[in-house]
Amino acid sequence: MGIRIQELRKQFEDFTALAGIDLDIRQGELLALLGPSGSGKTTLLRIIAGLEHADAGRVLFGDEDATTMSVQARRVGFVFQHYALFKHMSVYENVAFGLRVRRGKARWPESQISARVFELLSLVQLDGLEQRYPMQLSGGQRQRVALARALAIEPRVLLLDEPFGALDAQVRRDLRRWLREIHDRTGLTTVFVTHDQEEALELADRVAILNQGGIEQVASPDEVYNRPSSPFVYSFVGAVNRLPGCVGADGLEVAGIVLSCPPQLSGWGAVDLYVRPEDLVLDAQEGWSAIVLWSQRSGPRMRVRARLEHSAHEVEIELSSATDEYVEGQKLRLIPRHYGVFFSESGS
């Protein structure tokens, strides 16, 4: 089931959490809501869940208007960062809880509940742990129980609010791969909130970048990283060098050299060029002359910081570890192979 967000607005006193957001979430996709603290991503997730109400706008589940629906009527599975498990209940009882609190005809017989619980414990790879209590589990295992409980009610949509934020780095990486596998097996429309760029780019089908209550870009991880639509996206997703320049009769000039001007850039004026460290490459003949300030190996890569000779600007370069060593004072020549250009605030 797809979800449509139409002109959603939410104000908390003087703070604008959502400023008229429009977003289409496709059926069966895994969408990441990525942004800094205060960008509106968690507020948007809570409004989709029915835990928060918008001041204006609509939330549609398929063709059904869910804006005023209760949490129960929406049939949403929700997973929080801090598990929200019942400490006094076993793993089995936690997973069964949502099914047991149903009333009337909606209530399943105990045999069906039991079958569903064991099916989900197998899905989340917790077979044999049904009688343990949350305090007897690791953080990663607790989050798996939380997901099984969210899936038990057969939700139409699965929502996750920074589900791996409380876990250490290695466990987060393992659970990311596992969650992707679970999603592919269930086919549920899934939305998750994160401030971790690596997590969003690795896990999601598409990423929605939020900033100050608005959406900057919605695109595939590859497009968000390689073709950002705004300076904010360039700066927020991944490392980037920013260099001032100008567009005039001679084309795009940055730090003393003329570069190819992107066709979508219309007009003349002051601009900023954005180039990622891995997109600055060594060239024997063309480009900027630069002086190495320092270099450092980082795993399979080498990071080099250099100052452009004809300007006061410094850049970071990321090179393959197979390249030579670089020492302070060494001269290089650099050329950007891929970059983005945007008019600066003072530009036309």
Swiss-Prot record:
One of its GO terms (molecular function) is ABC-type sulfate transporter activity. Residues 3-237 form the ABC transporter domain. It is a peripheral membrane protein. It is an enzyme of class 7 (translocase). ATP binds at G35, P36, S37, G38, S39, G40, K41, T42. The keyword Repeat does not apply. Its main location: membrane. Its EC number is 7.3.2.3. Keywords: ATP-binding, Cell inner membrane, Cell membrane, Membrane, Nucleotide-binding, Sulfate transport, Translocase, Transport. Part of the ABC transporter complex CysAWTP involved in sulfate/thiosulfate import. Responsible for energy coupling to the transport system. Belongs to the ABC transporter superfamily. Sulfate/tungstate importer (TC 3.A.1.6) family. The complex is composed of two ATP-binding proteins (CysA), two transmembrane proteins (CysT and CysW) and a solute-binding protein (CysP). This is Sulfate/thiosulfate import ATP-binding protein CysA. It comes from Xylella fastidiosa (strain Temecula1 / ATCC 700964). The lineage of its organism: Bacteria, Pseudomonadati, Pseudomonadota, Gammaproteobacteria, Lysobacterales. The gene is cysA.
